[in-house]
Design a protein with these regions (language model features):
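Lipid interaction determinants
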Residues: 1-77, 84-145
Length: 145
């Protein structure tokens, strides 16, 4: 498949963690927010967060450790080059909030349905349970001038 179908901006509709027994949880809550961008030049960027995050007590960037931890636990972001191979899109992470992903590849199975894109990650351990993260994105269209 051509990478052309990916190009553009996408808005996160849902992000679920699914177990092999069918249990579903919501790592960023049931109403997450996020954007996913794919460029024609072969770059991508994704940001996902829990909706209605709590503001820091002050407007300064230096915050207490508890506030920083809460901010980290409710937000994720990375970017880099991408390529399409068969039914997988591979994100080659160059920068990431989670430092362990920098320099690594994040592989996602993909499926298009109309203006929706579903990305499914390989199983990961969350809370000691193997789960697949499934994100559903909706293509954003340019606002009318």
């Amino acid at each position: 498949m051509s990478a052309d179908r990916f190009v553009g901006a996408w808005r996160l509709l849902s992000l679920e963690a699914r177990t092999s027994t069918g249990e579903v949880s919501y790592p960023y809550g049931q109403d997450p927010a996020g954007h996913l961008l794919y460029s024609r030049e072969g770059y991508m960027s994704v940001s996902v967060m829990q909706a209605r995050r709590v503001n820091f007590a002050s407007d300064g960037l230096r915050a207490p450790a508890e506030e920083k931890l809460a901010a980290f636990d409710t937000y994720s972001s990375y970017s880099g080059r991408y390529e399409v191979r068969g039914q997988k899109v591979i994100h080659h992470v160059e920068i990431s909030l989670f430092p362990n992903w920098t320099g690594k590849a994040q592989k996602r199975l993909f499926e298009f349905s109309g203006d929706h894109l579903t990305l499914t990650a390989p199983p990961v351990q969350i809370g000691g349970v193997e789960q697949n993260l499934v994100a559903i994105w909706q293509r954003l269209h340019s606002p009318e001038a």
